[in-house]
Amino acid sequence: MDDGHQESALYDGHYEGDFWLFNNSSDNSQENKRFLKFKEVFLPCVYLVVFVFGLLGNSLVLIIYIFYQKLRTLTDVFLLNLPLADLVFVCTLPFWAYAGTYEWVFGTVMCKTLRGMYTMNFYVSMLTLTCITVDRFIVVVQATKAFNRQAKWKIWGQVICLLIWVVSLLVSLPQIIYGHVQDIDKLICQYHSEEISTMVLVIQMTLGFFLPLLTMILCYSGIIKTLLHARNFQKHKSLKIIFLVVAVFLLTQTPFNLAMLIQSTSWEYYTITSFKYAIVVTEAIAYFRACLNPVLYAFVGLKFRKNVWKLMKDIGCLSHLGVSSQWKSSEDSSKTCSASHNVETTSMFQL
């Protein structure tokens, strides 16, 4: 087996290469067999967990924004685009879970389509997170200008979201073009192209990690500086949520991207079993971003939580729980508190 084919057989991470990690049929050692067994059980389980919670959370966000919450601001536009991308992303996972347990039985067209959908929506999600960060910076740090231009910026938000989808589709084309089904002990849907593998890795690391990370550092630094000068009882809550957003991004995305970066420096890392485990586990951690986004970017908003209660009331959940009056009291209290918020803090939480 030549080096190019061996790499195709060994490495298949969703973010860069082929779907099946280190699936080398020529390596029959007990250590490698244990790793393959672990991967074939662990990854499908993770995919299904992320699928279930991601489907529920992102579907709820979409329902609220479509039926209960009008798109009045630029933030609303981005917060609609984010769950849409994450929802399509998680809907590809059951196919990979089945293929991980058995083999790829869905054909070449579905292989290309699902690889393209998976990659495109990953980029859409990460670029939308970047736009949300910039939007929050503008709204909090330049509150007066932001308030006066919300209607105009809403239109720009729709244009930006369209551009995000177009750019994400373009950078996903290698997955569609070079995705194919190959028989290596069993049928697998994989992607490999030595000619552009380095370019794909650079684009992936830039758009999927470094750009969002750098944007978060710069924008949230400005937001924190502004909030520290604000005299408002919600200031500390604002800072906690900012730190939570950054911490979740770092904890879920840094390990896998760091492992990918290290692995790209030497072929030896492709053959080290402990590093194979590291890639699989950190990749699984990165997937949980799709479950956490609804919590971080929607559920923290007072307006969103109120609309969730309205949805529950409409479908008859609250009448059996006897909490309508309790929610009414809480809602009135929230309105009183909201009236005392300054522009910065209101902009931060009225998502």
Curated annotation (Swiss-Prot):
Q: Which domain of life is it from?
A: Eukaryota
Entry's Gene Ontology cellular component terms: plasma membrane
Which function does this protein serve?
Receptor for the C-X-C chemokine CXCL16.
Which residues are noted as glycosylation sites?
Answer: N23, N24
Q: Where in the cell is it found?
A: Cell membrane
Q: By what name is this protein known?
A: C-X-C chemokine receptor type 6
Q: Which CDD domains match?
A: 7tmA_CXCR6 (cd15173)
* Residues in the Cytoplasmic compartment per record: 69-77, 135-152, 225-240, 303-351
Which terms does the record give in the GO molecular function aspect? C-X-C chemokine binding; C-X-C chemokine receptor activity; coreceptor activity
Which InterPro entries does the record match to this protein?
CCR1-9-like, Chemokine_CXCR6, Chemokine_rcpt, GPCR_Rhodpsn, GPCR_Rhodpsn_7TM
Extract one GO BP annotation from the record. Answer: inflammatory response
Membrane-crossing residue ranges in chain numbering: 42-68, 78-98, 113-134, 153-173, 197-224, 241-268, 285-302
State the organism of origin.
Answer: Mus musculus
List the disulfide bonds in this chain.
Answer: C111-C189
Topological relation to the membrane, as annotated? Multi-pass membrane protein
Q: Which residues, if any, are the signal sequence?
A: none
- Report the sequence similarity comment from the record: Belongs to the G-protein coupled receptor 1 family.
| Record topology, Extracellular segments | 1-41, 99-112, 174-196, 269-284
Q: Which UniProt keywords apply?
A: Cell membrane, Disulfide bond, G-protein coupled receptor, Glycoprotein, Membrane, Receptor, Transducer, Transmembrane, Transmembrane helix
Per its UniProt record, what SUPFAM superfamilies does this chain match?
Family A G protein-coupled receptor-like (SSF81321)
Gene (name only)? Cxcr6
